Amino acid sequence: MKSKNTPLYETCLNEGARMVEFAGWNMPIQFSGLINEHNAVRKNSGIFDISHMGVFSIQGKNPKDALQTLVPSDLHRIGPGEACYTVLLNNDGGIIDDLIVYDLGTNDPNNEECILIVINAGCTQADIDWIKEHLSDKNLKVCNAKGDGVLLALQGPDSTNQLRNVLGESLTNIPKFGHREIQVQLKTHPVSFSIFIARTGYTGEDGYEILLNTNAGKSLWRELIENGVTPCGLGARDTLRLEAGMPLYGNDINNTTTPFEAGLGWLVHLETPDEFIGKAALVKQTNEGINKKLVALKIEGRAIARKGYQIMFKNKFVGEITSGSWSPTLNEGIALAYLPIDLTKIGTAVSVQIRDKLHTAIVAKKPFYRRVS
């Protein structure tokens, strides 16, 4: 099947992007270089095209109640203008996908409630099929909310200043995981237009994710870059999220790993009376304990551990690297991996098979990097 292009495909090429296929899309892997882009986000700000992500609305009577049957997080902890990170689960408690749920409140003339979900590109169709199948009796409308539009991620400590400079709008009143819809205009797009903006991201930095129409998206992209924001590709997005200890679906989490095993137990609210798919499996795991856990590893020396590299302990195979890279911020090799529970204590030494040699790796505290305000 031919890979799809985002509306910013040509715009990214004009900025010097090197493209790769990712989850069925042609996406920029880098522009000026991974390390430069990574450091720009850590120190200033960077802009990502994430229009490959799935964005869907679920609208009708009590959509949060309906979605609550599919996720382990208490969705009633958020209200209009707020959002939360959670996961879809199968019957075994395995993770079908991770997603963000945004409560849009009642914004329809029919007085219907609406929530927005943002899901991973490679899981989009399977996720929507799963949701529609299990909510088929709820009389809800599940619609593609992105259409042919653009989804941008502006990330970094200077993000708020950059948006204020370009949009002329102060966004300091949007808290972390807050969101709102606002009317704005640009120098190159003088007709005012609506954007959905959320203070969310996948880098470990402050930042925003912005949904808007294609023409406005192209204009905003160009004006931010002209204002000094660095265009960034998936390469930097991966190293940034890895340093921040954020899992990547298909690598660090999948339908055979549970939230407790993945270090996402904080997403599970078993104390609520709500029933959800996978709850029984998670209750059982709470009572019996877990056999493996996703840990952070620091690789000694200059070696880089990649996905699939074998991990040994006392000459026995004990696991595989799920994600690994060189950390531009820490200047050392870092990785994530599932290890047997008795090897997950911080400071434990294991060995990673990198090419033909065994390299020592030390279990470290997650995340590798955390922004100090």
From Swiss-Prot:
Reactions performed catalytically: N(6)-[(R)-S(8)-aminomethyldihydrolipoyl]-L-lysyl-[protein] + (6S)-5,6,7,8-tetrahydrofolate = N(6)-[(R)-dihydrolipoyl]-L-lysyl-[protein] + (6R)-5,10-methylene-5,6,7,8-tetrahydrofolate + NH4(+)
Entry EC no(s): 2.1.2.10
GO biological process, one term: glycine decarboxylation via glycine cleavage system
GO molecular function: aminomethyltransferase activity; transaminase activity
Gene Ontology CC terms, in alphabetical order: cytosol; glycine cleavage complex
UniProt keyword list: Aminotransferase, Transferase
Family to which this protein belongs: Belongs to the GcvT family.
Protein's job: The glycine cleavage system catalyzes the degradation of glycine.
Record text on subunit structure and interactions: The glycine cleavage system is composed of four proteins: P, T, L and H.
Name of the protein in question: Aminomethyltransferase
Gene from which this protein is expressed: gcvT
